[in-house]
From Swiss-Prot:
The organism of origin for this protein: Staphylococcus saprophyticus subsp. saprophyticus (strain ATCC 15305 / DSM 20229 / NCIMB 8711 / NCTC 7292 / S-41)
GO cellular component: cytoplasm
Family note: Belongs to the glucosamine/galactosamine-6-phosphate isomerase family. NagB subfamily.
Protein role: Catalyzes the reversible isomerization-deamination of glucosamine 6-phosphate (GlcN6P) to form fructose 6-phosphate (Fru6P) and ammonium ion.
Catalysed reactions, semicolon-separated: alpha-D-glucosamine 6-phosphate + H2O = beta-D-fructose 6-phosphate + NH4(+)
UniProt keyword terms in alphabetical order: Carbohydrate metabolism, Hydrolase
Coiled coil: none
Entry protein name: Glucosamine-6-phosphate deaminase
Active site: 67, 137, 139, 144
The enzyme's E.C. designation: 3.5.99.6
Length: 242
């Protein structure tokens, strides 16, 4: 694992967009593990620019999103289905919809949905590149502190800190979903390559804990020490202090 400070969030986002584009252009049936949230906005913005400029054929690219809120249907403006459509799939509308996979947080039977999604990843994966953000409490996906390191796709009860952090996207904190469907930690580790991004001073503490080089269930992202091919890119504000 290597933590690299690329100075600004813009440059780091552009770098990761280039890495995704390179993977897609070199292997036209690439499988990508995608993330959402504020950290990824510029990654997708730059990726769309690269795709448009080069008119890349993405009809065989397959994607698997990390998570989705429980209780929001795909059309809800704050669902991660809507996020991905607005940030990427509608901006470059040449992906094959049947190859774009996001957990169904509004499924009638959520336990069956977690099993279905895990089985789908096992059948079609592993993904070539999994991109990740990190929460202030060290969560990746929606795997909160204390998550079993062997967890598969599962239903998560979100912590108060995560609910509070996500409340900026909703009219008020009461409207923020309290649960999510998330890839598990063991699911994430199946990827061939993992790229994690962290921007801003609020993420520094989590990155410093990640830099301690040991697996700690209280900081879920530390499970990445068990993976042989992890890259972490930060800006100046999130860079660990010496």
């Amino acid at each position: 694992m290597k933590i690299t400070n690329l100075g600004t969030s813009g440059y780091a986002s552009f770098y990761v967009a280039c890495e995704l584009y390179k993977q897609m252009s070199q292997q036209n049936h690439s499988k990508l593990g995608l993330a959402t949230g504020g950290t990824m906005v510029d990654v997708y913005r730059f990726l769309v620019q690269l795709l448009r400029k080069n008119k890349l054929d993405v009809s065989e690219i397959e994607t698997f999103n990390l998570d989705e809120y429980v209780g929001l249907d795909a059309q809800h403006e704050q669902s991660y289905h809507s996020y991905m459509n607005e940030m990427l799939f509608k901006q470059y509308p040449y992906f094959n919809p049947s190859l774009l996979h996001i957990p169904n947080g509004d499924a009638d039977n959520l336990n069956d949905e977690t099993k279905r999604y895990e089985q789908l990843i096992n059948q079609k994966g592993p993904v070539d590149i999994q991109i990740l953000g990190i929460g202030e409490n060290g969560h990746i996906g929606f795997n909160e502190p204390g998550t079993d390191i062997n967890s598969a796709t599962h239903i998560v009860d979100l912590t108060e800190s995560t609910i509070s952090a996500n409340s900026r996207y909703f009219d008020n904190e009461v409207d923020v979903p309290k649960q999510a469907v998330s890839m598990g930690l063991s699911t994430i580790l199946k990827a061939h390559r993992i790229i994690l991004l962290a921007f801003g001073e609020k993420k520094r503490a989590a990155i410093e804990k990640l830099a301690e080089n040991e697996v700690n269930s209280d900081v879920p992202a530390t499970i990445l020490h068990a993976h042989p091919n992890v890259e972490i890119y930060v800006d100046d504000e999130a860079a660990p202090r010496l």
